[in-house]
Amino acid sequence: MELSAKLVRSQLNFFKPFVANCSLEVTRKGQDKLGELMTALHKREVLVKDHPFERFQGAWVMPKDQRRTGVILYLHGGGYTCGSLEYAKGFAATLASECGVKVFCAAYRLAPENRFPAALEDALEAYRYLLKKGYAPGRSCCAVKAPAAD
């Protein structure tokens, strides 16, 4: 996982100066493309199955070579204003491939279109969905790309 993490980190550091002066729409489109690229890099290693919720979108990203039980709940970064299901699936594909475990990603509702606590409610709904599916807290973890730190 170290190589993939370095690759992702270098990509994000490279794009950060460009994104700083972009409109919200351009930033969102750029993140979508980054997610599509990352998913494509792992397409031979993972299966992706979308799972819609009433207020947001989610997806299962499952490694073809599953080596562990349990699940990772992945919540994308983006400062609560950016990030989509495509973006989340890209990072989830890397996690699933490298860790050999299922990843469920939730593309929570974004600001400014949706006010607080919409994103928090969506994250909680995704977590409760996993609990209902039988994933006990001790057999799951949450990976968050620091939404507020972007």
Model-derived features with residue positions:
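Short beta-to-alpha linker loops that shape the active-site pocket of alpha/beta-hydrolase fold enzymes
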Residues: 107-111
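Short beta-strand element of the alpha/beta-hydrolase
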Residues: 69-78
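Short amphipathic alpha-helix adjacent to the substrate-entry channel of hydrolases
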Residues: 86-106
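A glycine/proline-hinged amphipathic helix-loop "lid/cap" segment
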Residues: 1-61
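Serine-hydrolase catalytic-loop signature spanning alpha/beta hydrolases and amidase-signature enzymes
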Residues: 79-82, 87, 103, 129
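A generic structural signal for alpha->beta connector loops
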Residues: 45, 55, 100, 137-139
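Short strand-connecting beta-turns/loops that link adjacent beta-strands
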Residues: 65-67
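Short strand-loop-helix active-site module centered on a catalytic nucleophile
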Residues: 58, 73, 95, 116-150
